UniProtKB/Swiss-Prot annotation:
Protein name from the UniProt record: Putative 3-isopropylmalate dehydratase small subunit
Role noted for this protein: Catalyzes the isomerization between 2-isopropylmalate and 3-isopropylmalate, via the formation of 2-isopropylmaleate.
Gene assigned in the entry: leuD
GO MF: 3-isopropylmalate dehydratase activity
Cross-referenced PANTHER family: 3-ISOPROPYLMALATE DEHYDRATASE SMALL SUBUNIT, 3-ISOPROPYLMALATE DEHYDRATASE SMALL SUBUNIT 2-RELATED-RELATED
Amino acid sequence: MAGSSREYAAWALADYGFKVVIAGSFGDIHYNNELNNGMLPIVQPREVREKLAQLKPTDQVTVDLEQQKIISPVEEFTFEIDSEWKHKLLNSLDDIGITLQYEELIAAYEKQRPAYWQD
């Protein structure tokens, strides 16, 4: 297995099917671990979290990543996310996927780069 023991928390949430976690704060490492595992950590103030907690279990809450909104039956809330992470999540990209977007440029660079170790 790869990753630190701290990453197990994010893996556990992902294994249970969580796609979004709304909290008052996140530690930097956990926040990034959630993002790296395809989840969306959203920071919201207590007031918003309390309003969401008061909803009925049958009420549907939707998180619109593109519009950066949490949509509940009674109210909408906005949230912030880094534009690069937003792009990665919307396009199901990880670091390898991002690198592969530049595959042709990498190959072209490798072709023109001198091979100093070869005579």
